[in-house]
């Protein structure tokens, strides 16, 4: 691919990436609000779970969220810049050392818990308080 084509492609991708989502990593518990179309009406459905993997590839970036629903593990892959994602909220920061948390698939109950990163939680709380004072 020529240099000109690469720059054109990069400019196109930059234009398509419109909104910023909060920063999250593997091990974080997130709530993804997804737009669901049923018939002629549209509603927002919350999907809460643990981020077990991310793929950073520009416009094709994606992340996988795993939750336990009625005793069964359910995973869903979301395209980061998709129009069906209404918003993403980080509930808690997890402290993990692995890049992909696929080992959680084989664990259940208390064994599948992830330690909370208290330093990151305190830092986020301080940032929220500073933003509140600024307003």
From Swiss-Prot:
GO biological process: translation
Gene Ontology molecular-function annotations: structural constituent of ribosome
Transferase listed as a keyword: no
A GO term from the CC aspect: cytosolic large ribosomal subunit
SUPFAM superfamilies (alphabetical): Translation proteins SH3-like domain
Keywords: Ribonucleoprotein, Ribosomal protein
Known role: This protein is located at the 30S-50S ribosomal subunit interface and may play a role in the structure and function of the aminoacyl-tRNA binding site.
Family stated for the protein in its record: Belongs to the bacterial ribosomal protein bL19 family.
The protein's name: Large ribosomal subunit protein bL19
Organism expressing this protein natively: Xanthomonas oryzae pv. oryzae (strain KACC10331 / KXO85)
